Structure formats: C-alpha cells, structure tokens
Amino acid sequence: YKFKTSNCTGTVTFGAAGYVAKDKEMPVTLDIFAAEKDFTGVMKVTLPGENGKGIAYQSAVKCKAGEKEKIVLNVPQLGNPSAICFEIMDSFGVTELSEDVSFSDAKNRNGAFSEQAENLIGVLSGQSKELSYLNSLKIGEESDEESVKVVCYSKNSFPQTEEEFQGLDGMIIDSFDTKSLSGKQKSALKSWLKSGGKLLIAGGGQQIDSFEGLEKTFGIIQEDVVVSELYLADADNTVQELPILM
C-alpha cells in the first residue's frame, strides 16, 4: 500500500511482489522517498506471538532528502498472518506511520497481500501471458497437492537485493533480453543462486537473449545438453558449480 508522512512518501509491499508463500519467510519491502530533509529511523514489523504478545522485527532506514531508498526486511510467518502491524519511527522513537495490515482488508488486496500459495515461481519474460497456465498447476501426490502461483516481473520490478527473492521456490527467465538488467539485479540474482535459489532459462529460439546478458557476470557455459553449469568464483578463488536448466 501507499503511505505519506510529514516528510516521506512511498509504498510497502508484503511478500514477493505482493504474493506470500505459506510457511516461508516473508520479505517486507519499503520503498521510501524523503522530500524536504533527510530521514533516519527504523521500519518495524510486529507479528502475533503467544499470550497476545507481539514479536517485533526491525531494520534501519536512512534516506537523504530528494532521494529514494529501498529496504527489505525478511520476517517469519507466525500465528495468524492476517494480523500484522507495520510501523515507521524516526531516530527519536516517534511513530511516523502505524498500520495494521490484513489479508481481508479491501485496501490491501491489491497491494499488501494479493494471494497465498504453497509455491511461488518468479517469471521474467517478454511473453509472460503465455506462461499463465502455470497458475493452474498442482504438484505433489494427488492426496497432498500443492498450488503454484506465478509472480511476474518486469525489468523495473525485478529484485535488486537477495532478500527480495525470499519466498520464491524458483525463477524462470524466458524470452527476455537479460542485457537490460542492471548490475544490482544481476548481483542479487547471483547471490540468491549461491544461497540455493533455482533458475530456469527458457525461450526456444530466443533463448540466446535470455542467457547472453548473464554469460559474462555468471560465466554460463552452454553445452550440447539441456543442463549448463554456473561457475562462481569466491574471494578466495574457490569455484562453486551450480546447475542451470536451459
């Protein structure tokens, strides 16, 4: 949802692009703009705990006048996810914004929470509508099926930090020119893959556009089989190999 204080404006998004995966950490993303003066404070998310006591998580917020900042705080899903309190406080502890966020609250349906699913799959594609059939998929045994929800990204909305990938079970890059992604976005994707994220590169005849922009950053080596390797060199020159389906 959108917010406005005496000095700041911005948006707060709960989940991956507004979608929440069950039983996974939930990224809370604050996009903030400070208008007339610098803002220093904290963003705070309070979840319901035992005996009616809330459990709070917070992250520092620093934003210079006339600039925008993005802060991502990952929180576990505890108790009733429909009862979440979001706050922004300044450096003196004065509350600038306090909102109780609810799944059922009409004003949050298209912003804070759009939908819950057992599995969230991110899609970055030039033809995302053609992949909408993935939303009807069920995975697992018939007696224990889990739903799949596709989270569509554009060049502008694609994550810029590893934390923003939290909650996603995988990412599909399909028929998309990855050369248009920023260095921040590529670095975030790289970090997420190193921490266990899964990436599928597709696109048929346009597959070259999908991996060409990642080739230099990641060292993708396309082989004659459908699986390639991603070689990531750490600071100590040790090499980590990660499979990427292509």
Describe the function of each predicted region:
Residues 37-52:
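Short acidic, flexible loop segments centered on an aromatic residue
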Residues 18-24:
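Short, solvent-exposed loop/linker segments at the N-terminal edge
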Residues 1-9:
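Proline/serine/threonine-rich low-complexity linkers at boundaries of modular beta-sandwich domains
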Residues 160-163, 173-246:
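A glycine-rich, often tryptophan-bearing local segment used as a flexible ligand/cofactor-contacting loop or short
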Residues 24, 79-170, 174, 205:
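Aromatic-Pro/Gly-enriched surface loop or interdomain linker
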Residues 27-33:
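Short edge beta-strand/loop segments characteristic of extracellular beta-sandwich folds
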Residues 49-81:
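Intrinsically disordered, low-complexity Pro/Gly/Ser/Thr-rich segments with frequent PxxP/GP/PP motifs
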